[in-house]
Amino acid sequence: MSWQSYVDDHLMCEVEGNHLTHAAIFGQDGSVWAQSSAFPQLKPAEIAGINKDFEEAGHLAPTGLFLGGEKYMVVQGEAGAVIRGKKGPGGVTIKKTTQALVFGIYDEPMTGGQCNLVVERLGDYLIESGL
């Protein structure tokens, strides 16, 4: 299965009638493996900040999480595994796997819980597959 298929079929799938707004899978080095259309263009410093937060939980909390220049308030995640951010009625979930970063960005009516489910389920599958 191609990386784009993971984005299209597993991240952008329908959940209780709702969809993620944007989704992507990046290498931990910041390389784009696959992404939905109009996924924000991430800057190297943004990827570096995300990786640093996975190494040192709470690193992004004082400044916020930035994706394509958009600021998200960091909310409770899972140290070394999941970063969650909130921005207005939407937010983001980022799951770290062995080799990748799985991103899901949502807006209402999708909920943070639905986004977490979609992103973390694929992330856990990739971890189990050694990816």
From Swiss-Prot:
Species this chain originates from: Arabidopsis thaliana
Source domain of life: Eukaryota
Signal peptide: none
Protein name per its UniProtKB record: Profilin-2
Main location: cytoplasm
Pfam families: Profilin
GO cellular component, one term: cytoplasm
PROSITE patterns: PROFILIN
